[in-house]
Amino acid sequence: MTNIRKSHPLMKIVNHSLIDLPAPSNISAWWNFGSLLGLCLGIQIITGLFLAMHYTSDTLTAFSSVTHICRDVNYGWIIRYLHANGASMFFICLFLHVGRGIYYGSYTYSETWNIGILLLFAVMATAFMGYVLPWGQMSFWGATVITNLLSAIPYIGTDLVQWIWGGFSVDKATLTRFFAFHFILPFIIAALVMVHLLFLHETGSNNPTGIISDADKIPFHPYYTVKDALGFLLLIALLLTLVLFSPDLLGDPDNYTPANPLNTPPHIKPEWYFLFAYAILRSIPNKLGGVLALVLSIAILAVMPLLHTSKQRSMMFRPISQCLFWVLVADLLTLTWIGGQPVEHPFIIIGQLASFLYFSLILILMPTCSLIENKLLKW
């Protein structure tokens, strides 16, 4: 008799995706972040669901409802901080996952890569709207500043902003719709994840060498299920350490002050994971130019498959490209630091140079470097 795992219509799909899936034998810990992102999404959906049971999306009671969750709801404080710090973990895993894709040339699977970019945009949108919900000072002013950027769009900009706000300023209508979108988007993300995996399983996983590994595959279970389980354990340990010992480490103290439209905070800045994009936005004095640069800072990932000029897929055996990759990482860390600094000398010029370097590396330096490496190999 055939095993139910291989014959049952539903079990068969799970079996082909998680159990009998042929996987390369040499994928390293950098390949753990896909499953860790799945875990993060699960944690966010579950904690978010419990928070939504107690939260009220009204400007008069939103801040109080979050306080009520932390003080009066059973274990509400841990649910709230798991959700807030879970977002930070989500982005840490996302950045490492994308970084691994760039380093090992996984972007050559263009369908999987493009769905991944869509996922990145969706997660960023969800996180932004979630940050508005507690209705603290940074929530309100962050929402005002970022939504206002759309007014830079020629002709329809102002109407578009007022349509999104549901009025002439960020108010009750804005908060209600942001809550609705923040609730539905994670489920859209989960659906996109399925498409992402569907495309990935069409081609099979890449591996550190970038060489086709069809000749040397091993079953996903037990080898990579055990490896993923260890990753889960480490991620949960890190998240719980953050939540139980220093829950406000990555937050902004201004968000513990209720939103006040009459009082602007001295430094309006987003959560740490958006600071690099915020620094790129601020580095261009023109409003429309800044908005375009902001969108392009993520959208530029879509041109990476087109700019792959190397004869080798992975950077594993390309030392010059490796150097440029780590310069890119250092540049993004610099942009993250600049995004949190006030707009004054010398931070303005550092931000402009770092932004210029970011686009130059991806569009010019890395493809040129790949061509030089091809020449060095006499190909």
From Swiss-Prot:
One of its GO terms (cellular component) is respiratory chain complex III. Its main location: mitochondrion. The chain crosses the membrane at residues 33-53, 77-98, 113-133, 178-198, 226-246, 288-308, 320-340, 347-367. It is a multi-pass membrane protein. Keywords: Electron transport, Heme, Iron, Membrane, Metal-binding, Mitochondrion, Mitochondrion inner membrane, Respiratory chain, Transmembrane, Transmembrane helix, Transport, Ubiquinone. Component of the ubiquinol-cytochrome c reductase complex (complex III or cytochrome b-c1 complex) that is part of the mitochondrial respiratory chain. The b-c1 complex mediates electron transfer from ubiquinol to cytochrome c. Contributes to the generation of a proton gradient across the mitochondrial membrane that is then used for ATP synthesis. This is Cytochrome b. It comes from Ochotona curzoniae (Black-lipped pika).
